[in-house]
């Protein structure tokens, strides 16, 4: 109220936000809205995210428009310890009937957390069953709002846990928790058949080496 929306006839939603389309455009092609007034998220970082789409669409919409992408919107609750998340959690996955697997890594095992007296919390990752694609992540612990960024990037750009595991993380840092969570997922999906074949191969090689050493010992000098 008080911004002239009533006079212009621009509708508002039940949540009392300005009604916009996927391009953040109101019923008037030259009026856009973003941030808290547009919703659906009341976050400063989401407002900044929307501002890019609103600005670009307002300036260049006659050539091409971009729908606002909400596929990887993160948020954090700055309690003690912090709680941060992005994507689906288990409750949402069940409500939407989305199949998922859960991998959990306890931050109490992390060297940096132990050294700083912050050895509590966890990293919980939801993935597509049998694949490393990230569906959502929840982190509880010190600096959770900082740690979640790696997973935001992973979800936004289609990076799986294998890539995170293969990325060098500085030791000792809290960020290693992300790598170790990916490592926990990898261990749960290790190729059992291949490992058994490798075990047999090395056992055979050890036996072969032992036989060769025995023959060399028996040969006259």
Residue ranges of predicted features:
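Flexible, glycine-rich terminal cap/loop adjacent to redox cofactors
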Residues: 73, 78-89, 94-221
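Rossmann-like dinucleotide-binding cores of NAD(P)H-dependent redox enzymes
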Residues: 41-48, 56-92
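FAD-site-proximal beta/loop scaffold in flavoenzymes
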Residues: 1-64, 150, 165
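Solvent-exposed alpha-helices and their adjacent loops that cap or buttress functional pockets
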Residues: 25-26, 30, 69-70, 115-117
């Amino acid at each position: 109220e008080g911004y002239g929306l009533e006079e212009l006839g621009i509708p508002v939603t039940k949540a009392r936000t300005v009604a916009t389309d996927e391009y953040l455009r109101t019923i008037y092609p030259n009026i856009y809205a973003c941030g808290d007034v547009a919703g659906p998220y009341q976050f400063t970082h989401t407002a900044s995210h929307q501002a890019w789409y609103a600005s670009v669409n307002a300036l260049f919409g006659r050539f091409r428009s971009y729908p606002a992408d909400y596929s990887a919107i993160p948020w954090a609750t700055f309690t003690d310890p912090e709680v941060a998340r992005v994507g689906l959690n288990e409750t949402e996955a069940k409500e939407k009937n989305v199949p998922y697997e859960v991998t959990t890594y306890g931050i109490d095992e992390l060297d940096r957390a132990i050294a700083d007296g912050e050895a509590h919390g966890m990293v919980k990752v939801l993935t597509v069953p049998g694949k490393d694609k990230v569906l959502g992540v929840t982190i509880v612990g010190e600096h959770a709002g900082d740690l979640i960024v790696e997973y935001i990037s992973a979800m936004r750009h289609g990076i799986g846990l294998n890539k995170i595991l293969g990325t060098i993380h500085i030791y000792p840092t809290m960020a290693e928790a992300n790598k170790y969570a990916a490592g926990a997922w990898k261990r749960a999906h290790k190729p059992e058949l291949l490992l058994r074949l490798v075990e047999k191969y090395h056992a055979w090689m050890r036996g072969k080496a032992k036989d060769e050493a025995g023959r060399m010992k028996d040969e006259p000098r």
